[in-house]
Every structure is written in structure tokens, then in C-alpha cells.
């Protein structure tokens, strides 16, 4: 491990210290390493041909104009990416789905975009993890 020096403006340093404290880091270096790893992983997922895993989560109203069947159709269209799906009934109207995906990150992103863009889907979020060698 090597030691490096960086210069941060006061506001950014205060934000880093606040984040470090909230997340329970022992020091700034640990926080900065995790932030950098996250940024590098995100960058890697944007490169064409990158293989990896992802978690897609979203909420939708199951009774809304064939939305559930459209989502299932989209999932079947991209069946090669799906590892598992968890379906949770939040209340009488809303469902939460969490899909674990595996494959080319550009295909995963395309699938996520297709699901999240469906009218009636809310709180869509894709978390990508590039495959580590």
C-alpha cells in the first residue's frame, strides 16, 4: 500500500468527515478507498463487453393496465440475464421486485432501462458489480 496526499476544499472535507462518521469508517483513508472502488466499478460497468452482476429493484402497482404482464414479458425477453427474482407485496396495490442479473453490463443496463421506463414503475434502481478476475 502506498501513501498519497490530496488537497480538498473545506466543504468537501467536511462532507467526507460526515460521511465517514455516519458509515462508521475508522479513518478518511478507508472512506476514500471505498468511494474510489465504487467509482471504478461504476466506470467498469459502462464499458462494452464488461461482464458482471447487477441488482435491479423497482416498485409497481400490480393492477395498473397490464403492467405486471408487460414486466413479465420484458423479463422473458431477457431471460438469459436473470438469475433470480424476489417479489414482495408491499400493500394492497404495490409490489416490490428485486431481480439479480448476470451478463454483459450493456445488456443488463438495456434490460433495466426497459423495465424502469414502463409507465407505472417507480423507484427503479440498478446497482452494477463488474466481475472481478
From Swiss-Prot:
<keyword id="KW-0479">Metal-binding</keyword>
<dbReference type="InterPro" id="IPR002145">
    <property type="entry name" value="CopG"/>
</dbReference>
<dbReference type="Pfam" id="PF01402">
    <property type="entry name" value="RHH_1"/>
</dbReference>
<feature type="binding site">
    <location>
        <position position="95"/>
    </location>
    <ligand>
        <name>Ni(2+)</name>
    </ligand>
</feature>
<dbReference type="GO" id="GO:0016151">
    <property type="term" value="F:nickel cation binding"/>
</dbReference>
<keyword id="KW-0533">Nickel</keyword>
<comment type="subunit">
    <text>Homotetramer.</text>
</comment>
<dbReference type="InterPro" id="IPR050192">
    <property type="entry name" value="CopG/NikR_regulator"/>
</dbReference>
<dbReference type="GO" id="GO:0010045">
    <property type="term" value="P:response to nickel cation"/>
</dbReference>
<dbReference type="InterPro" id="IPR014160">
    <property type="entry name" value="Nickel_NikR_proteobac"/>
</dbReference>
<feature type="binding site">
    <location>
        <position position="76"/>
    </location>
    <ligand>
        <name>Ni(2+)</name>
    </ligand>
</feature>
<keyword id="KW-0804">Transcription</keyword>
<keyword id="KW-0678">Repressor</keyword>
<keyword id="KW-0238">DNA-binding</keyword>
<dbReference type="InterPro" id="IPR010985">
    <property type="entry name" value="Ribbon_hlx_hlx"/>
</dbReference>
<dbReference type="InterPro" id="IPR013321">
    <property type="entry name" value="Arc_rbn_hlx_hlx"/>
</dbReference>
<dbReference type="GO" id="GO:0043565">
    <property type="term" value="F:sequence-specific DNA binding"/>
</dbReference>
<dbReference type="Pfam" id="PF08753">
    <property type="entry name" value="NikR_C"/>
</dbReference>
<dbReference type="InterPro" id="IPR022988">
    <property type="entry name" value="Ni_resp_reg_NikR"/>
</dbReference>
<comment type="function">
    <text>Transcriptional repressor of the nikABCDE operon. Is active in the presence of excessive concentrations of intracellular nickel.</text>
</comment>
<dbReference type="InterPro" id="IPR027271">
    <property type="entry name" value="Acetolactate_synth/TF_NikR_C"/>
</dbReference>
<feature type="binding site">
    <location>
        <position position="87"/>
    </location>
    <ligand>
        <name>Ni(2+)</name>
    </ligand>
</feature>
<keyword id="KW-0805">Transcription regulation</keyword>
<comment type="similarity">
    <text>Belongs to the transcriptional regulatory CopG/NikR family.</text>
</comment>
<dbReference type="InterPro" id="IPR045865">
    <property type="entry name" value="ACT-like_dom_sf"/>
</dbReference>
<dbReference type="InterPro" id="IPR014864">
    <property type="entry name" value="TF_NikR_Ni-bd_C"/>
</dbReference>
<dbReference type="GO" id="GO:0003700">
    <property type="term" value="F:DNA-binding transcription factor activity"/>
</dbReference>
<protein>
    <recommendedName>
        <fullName>Nickel-responsive regulator</fullName>
    </recommendedName>
</protein>
<feature type="binding site">
    <location>
        <position position="89"/>
    </location>
    <ligand>
        <name>Ni(2+)</name>
    </ligand>
</feature>
Amino acid at each position: 500500500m502506498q501513501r498519497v496526499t490530496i488537497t480538498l476544499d473545506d466543504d468537501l472535507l467536511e462532507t467526507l468527515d460526515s460521511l465517514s462518521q455516519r458509515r462508521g469508517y475508522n479513518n478518511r483513508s478507508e472512506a476514500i478507498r471505498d468511494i474510489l472502488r465504487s467509482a471504478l466499478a461504476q466506470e467498469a460497468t459502462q464499458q462494452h463487453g464488461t461482464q458482471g452482476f447487477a441488482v435491479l429493484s423497482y416498485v409497481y402497482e400490480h393492477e395498473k393496465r397490464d403492467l405486471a404482464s408487460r414486466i413479465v414479458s420484458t423479463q422473458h425477453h431477457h431471460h438469459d440475464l436473470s438469475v433470480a427474482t424476489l417479489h414482495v407485496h408491499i400493500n394492497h396495490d404495490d409490489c416490490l421486485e428485486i431481480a439479480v442479473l448476470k451478463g454483459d453490463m450493456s445488456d443488463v443496463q438495456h434490460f433495466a432501462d426497459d423495465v424502469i421506463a414502463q409507465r407505472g414503475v417507480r423507484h427503479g434502481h440498478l446497482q452494477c458489480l463488474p466481475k472481478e478476475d
